[in-house]
Amino acid sequence: MSIIEKKIVLLPGDHVGVEVVEEAVKILKSISEVKPEIQFKFENHLIGGAAIDATGVPLPDEALEAAKKSDAVLLGAVGGPKWGTGEVRPEQGLLKIRKELNLYANLRPCNFASDKLLDLSPLKSDIVKGTDFTVVRELVGGIYFGDRVEDDGSGFASDSESYSVPEVERITRMAAFLSLQNDPPLPIWSLDKANVLASSRLWRKTVDRVIKEEFPKLTVQHQLIDSAAMILVKSPTKLNGIVITNNMFGDIISDEASVIPGSLGLLPSASLASLPDTNQAFGLYEPCHGSAPDLPKNKVNPIATILSAAMMLKLSLNLVKEGNAVEEAVRKVLDQGIMTGDLGGNNSTTEVGDAIAKEVKLLLA
């Protein structure tokens, strides 16, 4: 029996981040219990407020170096009122690690882990049932990283949006490979503002060319971002598939999409530095929710982090079967009504984690 060893750097961060990472590790260890040939080597490091308290900086050098040498990074959450908005802030650690690891693509799925949760959506259940898309957001270009002029008292300020062909090419390839991981391949939706912005016209032209030349079996449809925002509320299933867009549009549309499933405690995310064509992309995985400093102990929903770990298994660790088993285990547990308070249940964080770990072992035995 050949041993598969995967090195995972854990960055629990602050407040509930510690709890949710513990539950995700519990799930990963449950895989090794029934499949001893799969071994996870965990290495804990500090980030965010916890790192500031211990070292004075939000991301210690040793944490960054460990992340660079790992197969993947699993992060909890950072921040909290304790650290305020001073010169050194917890969130700076997150921004730095994303930049240093060159995480250029952010993936945020929008779906229902169980149909039992449809009534939690602020939209009508018959409108949202069947919603299943992933927003692929370009993470290191665009207006957030463009030239900036601050108001110096003159009453003028500006931000500039720019994209290069290589930047658009690589995010398009990311979307294409994610599409191809499904049989049949998923449709691709590209969101832009090509009727106004020059950068969007370059974006649209480049997306079209890459799909046509490199992925002729795939389909891509273009949608103006303002129209897409309306579709997302009126009929979100129309965007099912892979949704690709630039940094600012992706920031906004993924936050809009995040309210559809009814709780941030359900939503995973991945930030990748390379293509998942061999299911071994390097990535950082984290829940979409924050550190929730006011939440009592053992009340946080761990599912977003557990589903982030499932994404990690499939995209970075080449353990697709195991990742699918984790997602199925989450569905089974929710179908049984085992859930935390944000979903209307009365189970604790650890009870939900224990139940999912049990189902994972049954599925993989």
Curated annotation (Swiss-Prot):
SMART domains: Iso_dh. Pfam families: Iso_dh. Its EC number is 1.1.1.85. GO terms for molecular function: 3-isopropylmalate dehydrogenase activity; magnesium ion binding; NAD binding. Its main location: cytoplasm. Substrate binds at residues 98, 108, 137, 226. Binds 1 Mg(2+) or Mn(2+) ion per subunit. Pathway: Amino-acid biosynthesis; L-leucine biosynthesis; L-leucine from 3-methyl-2-oxobutanoate: step 3/4. It is found in: Cytoplasm. It comes from the Eukaryota. GO terms for cellular component: cytosol. It catalyses: (2R,3S)-3-isopropylmalate + NAD(+) = 4-methyl-2-oxopentanoate + CO2 + NADH. Belongs to the isocitrate and isopropylmalate dehydrogenases family. This is 3-isopropylmalate dehydrogenase. It comes from Candida boidinii.
